[in-house]
Amino acid sequence: MRIAILGGTYNPVHIGHIFLAKEIEYLLNIDRVIFIPTCNPAHKLIDENVSVSNRIDMLKLALENEDKMFIDDCDIINGGITYTVDTISCVKKKYKNDKLFLIIGDDLFQNFDSWKDPQSIVSSVELVVAHRIYKERLKSSFKHIYIDNKIIPISSSEIRNRIVNGLPVSYLLPFGVLKYIKDNNLYVKKVNV
């Protein structure tokens, strides 16, 4: 089986994530896309008002009608700071005989050499770089594949900011995720009394 790994905070998951997963399915002939929500990413802070279970619930809602997309909670179970090399080790134990593709955006790829044990990563999986912010292909000494995906100019941080500022986000999120955010009062300004 050909399996793509998409790690991220998914805070919240949005249509850009799902669109990229669909592009990956098509462009790389992928049998399964595994979304891996990070526990505590090494290079990013997560809003403390949104729990791990909130993020997983939103992912479940976003993927409920997708037959090739699944969630793996290995980073959540392992806890602590999340490093990609450790995530891959966990995934490889479950999918021993499958071909694994690690998908990262070019925004992350530009600093890939500073990641924990990048050589081990490229030795374990096919590193696939997706356009996220750059139209041109970045160069690197690390073995990688670039896909010519469409750039969807959206980010979870932009969505959170729009919600805080009372701006519409309905066209940026799967319906179930939008409803969950509203029902659970996520990402809104907390008023101190």
UniProtKB/Swiss-Prot annotation:
GO terms for molecular function: ATP binding; nicotinate-nucleotide adenylyltransferase activity. Keywords: ATP-binding, NAD, Nucleotide-binding, Nucleotidyltransferase, Pyridine nucleotide biosynthesis, Transferase. It catalyses: nicotinate beta-D-ribonucleotide + ATP + H(+) = deamido-NAD(+) + diphosphate. GO terms for biological process: NAD biosynthetic process. Disulfide bonds: none annotated. Its EC number is 2.7.7.18. InterPro entries: Cyt_trans-like, NadD/NMNAT, Rossmann-like_a/b/a_fold. Pathway: Cofactor biosynthesis; NAD(+) biosynthesis; deamido-NAD(+) from nicotinate D-ribonucleotide: step 1/1. CDD domains: NMNAT. It is an enzyme of class 2 (transferase). SUPFAM superfamilies: Nucleotidylyl transferase. The keyword ATP-binding applies. Catalyzes the reversible adenylation of nicotinate mononucleotide (NaMN) to nicotinic acid adenine dinucleotide (NaAD). PANTHER family: NICOTINATE-NUCLEOTIDE ADENYLYLTRANSFERASE-RELATED, PHOSPHOPANTETHEINE ADENYLYLTRANSFERASE. Belongs to the NadD family. This is Probable nicotinate-nucleotide adenylyltransferase. It comes from Borreliella burgdorferi (strain ATCC 35210 / DSM 4680 / CIP 102532 / B31) (Borrelia burgdorferi). The gene is nadD.
